[in-house]
Amino acid sequence: MSTDNTMPIGQLRWDATSARGPRATNADATAGRTDPAAGRWAFAVADGVGDNPAAAHAARAAADAAVAATAADPRGAILAAREALADQPDTGDCVLVVAVAGAEHACEIAWVGDCRAYLWADGALRQLTEDHTLAVYFRTRNLPVTPGMDHVVTTSVRTAEPALIGRTQVTLRTGRLLLCTDGVHKTLPAARLRSILERAATPADAVADLVDAAHRLGGQDNATALVVDRTADHAANSSAA
């Protein structure tokens, strides 16, 4: 199911899609907010913890609150999402990745849990985030990892504290930014992610192909992807001519 939100903002275009897959509930959510006049934008992908309506409500509330936050620091967007869930005690919990416009061509990214951000640019795919999972915690300390640890998150929106929120920055002059849930990145190998992002003509094509590929490869989770394309000024001007 596409969210049907491809739209231009200067040289920026984006789209998102999400599919329930074999789960009973689609507990993933996406959100985007753009301000062409100010050159500001924010995008979020959330994954509810669990397969139930409470998890779905948490993901939706968190994603919406994150992109509505006015802070340029994406950690502020995560904390705004935390406050939104605190106001809804009967709602569940979720993990979240947020990307916001920074100074010049910077893209500021923050996350809790195992939603990811990738950048496809100059013929290469870079994973920008590091999963907050028990498996990563053990691997970074050279401790043995047991099956299932990749699916146990160590941070979430409800437990978010400034010091625990992941943060990174990347220059986005041209390229393709991907935000996705683990239903995509834990199912598709990096080579498959790269090939889809490379060949897709538009963000709408990219997200549809990513989610479809995840389920065709036997993914057992909700699958959600949001793609943002940034093109150079001269390319945008040429296409508008």
Show which residues each predicted segment covers.
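PP2C/PPM-type serine/threonine phosphatase catalytic domain
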Residues: M1-A241
